[in-house]
A protein has these predicted regions:
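Intrinsic-disorder/low-complexity, polar/charged segments enriched in Ser/Thr/Lys/Arg/Asp/Glu/Gln
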Residues: 3-5, 43, 96
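Short, ordered, surface-exposed loop/turn motifs in non-cytosolic proteins
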Residues: 14-33, 37-40, 332
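Conserved, single-site charged/polar hotspot
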Residues: 21-23, 37, 47-49, 73-406
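Clustered cysteine/histidine zinc-coordinating segments, centered on FYVE zinc fingers that bind PI3P
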Residues: 2-3, 27, 47-49, 57-58, ...
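A short, solvent-exposed loop/turn motif at the edges and junctions
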Residues: 54-85
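Short, acidic Ser/Thr/Gly-rich low-complexity loop/linker segments typical of extracellular
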Residues: 31-58, 348
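Structural motif
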Residues: 2-3, 7-20
Length: 406
């Protein structure tokens, strides 16, 4: 039987507060398969689980669901027991399930949520075109001065006019990983995955740039429904190939010709409609050796290009250059102090004794451990993606401890 893998990360409220020694139980059909405790960084070891063959995720018309599902239950002292149903496991892929526990509420015995099916497998309402939506609303969107990557976006978990649906504040990068994991299959060629991620990012940034919903009086950035936007799954499973690709290109987006705004890059599972990316079609192009930009141009036109957006948000340290062992600079000194600070919440990261600004072997080991904990490629070299994550985690911990920002 095919095998897939699962890593569970357990936090108390935020990523700044990992939970050590939480009990994680994996079950299927109410039968326990494995129970394991989290380590000092709130993480389980990689768990091997049975699943279906990856060929089912490579054929559009297959009648067998291309992944297996399991339930994950977590208990920890002083926190509400939590259960995520329908955690998805693909053949040869590592799934990442982040679980956020809350303080015990005497009115809630257990917090239960479900990972809904991937949009390529489940049944979801068709998208309403923006032209038709504009006709209905009769309102033109605003535009911002520049294209930026926000720290967070607000996701409305329902249709725009459903006032009972909750709003969730989600880190931008986490949102993109969630949508991509909900919309495509992680077993596909990496260039196909990147092309779809670029479409997802561009669509999202267009919603931000045009203030699509806020200009109409709504208090959110985007919805979770495929009727209007793209699928966001609360507590959804994230897949390692998708996570790694997002970390690599999260600040990239598509533009057409000399137009400044991000392309509102529409896509469907299978379509020949002009101006839409076909998800299954992009998989076929990836199989043929097309790279991400070639796939993008195949669907959106040869005058499309990829641009980088600036980051905005409460990040106290900007990226300047790649850092590696042997470097000696103020940036290295800052890096060493950031790592030691993060270690206050993640004690599995080795301490760097007497930070001096010299990128020594101790610094390399600390960087490798940090990268491993947060799902980055463990090279020991600090690139843009690692620096962004360092700054993000530093800020989250600082907020939790009220060290910076009110």
């Amino acid at each position: 039987m095919a095998k897939g893998y699962l890593i569970v990360n357990v936090y108390s409220d935020t990523i700044a507060n990992p939970v050590e020694n939480a009990t994680v139980t994996i079950s299927k059909n109410d039968k326990e398969i494995v129970a394991i405790n989290t380590n000092e960084d709130g993480q389980t070891e990689k768990i091997t689980l049975d699943t279906v063959d990856k060929s089912y995720s490579e054929e559009e018309q297959h009648e067998t669901r291309p992944y297996e599902t399991y339930d994950v239950s977590v208990t920890a002292l002083g926190l509400t027991p939590t259960k995520i149903e329908g955690v998805q496991i693909f053949d040869e892929i590592t799934s990442i399930q982040n679980i956020y526990l809350t303080s015990i509420d005497e009115n809630q015995l257990e917090d239960i949520s479900e990972v809904t099916p991937n949009t390529l497998w489940g049944e979801y309402p068709p998208n309403i075109s923006e032209v038709e939506e504009e006709k209905e609303e009769g309102i033109a969107p605003f535009v911002l001065r520049e294209v930026v990557i926000p720290a967070n976006i607000i996701v409305h978990d329902g249709t725009p006019n459903n006032l009972d649906a909750p709003n969730y504040t989600v880190p931008f990068v986490d949102y993109i990983k969630n949508v991509a994991s909900s919309e495509i299959y992680s077993t596909w060629p990496i260039e196909t995955i990147k092309a779809n991620i670029l479409a997802i990012i561009s669509f999202t940034l267009n919603r931000i740039y045009t203030e699509w919903y806020r200009s109409k009086g709504y208090n959110f950035t985007i919805t979770s429904t495929t009727s209007y936007d793209q699928r966001y799954t609360r507590n959804g499973t994230i897949f390692e190939p998708i996570s790694n690709a997002v970390d690599e290109i999260f600040n990239n987006y598509i533009r057409v010709g000399i137009r400044l705004e991000p392309l509102p890059a529409h896509y469907k599972s299978s379509t020949t409609e002009d101006g839409y990316l076909s998800q299954w079609g992009s998989k076929d192009l990836g199989d043929k050796g097309y790279n991400a930009l070639e796939i993008i141009r195949y669907y959106y036109g040869n005058n499309t290009n990829i641009y980088e957006a600036e980051l905005t948000g409460p990040y106290p340290y900007s990226f300047t250059t790649i850092l590696r062992q042997g470097d000696c600079s103020q940036d290295v000194y800052t890096l060493q102090n950031i790592l030691n600070y993060i270690r206050s919440s993640y004690p599995g990261i080795p301490v760097i004794e007497n930070p001096s600004g010299l990128f020594n072997s101790d610094t390399t080991e600390a960087v490798k451990k940090f990268q491993s904990v947060f799902g980055l490629t463990s090279t020991g070299t600090v690139n843009y993606q690692t620096w962004y994550m360092l700054s993000y985690i530093f800020t989250a911990i600082a907020k939790m401890t009220n060290s910076i920002y009110s």
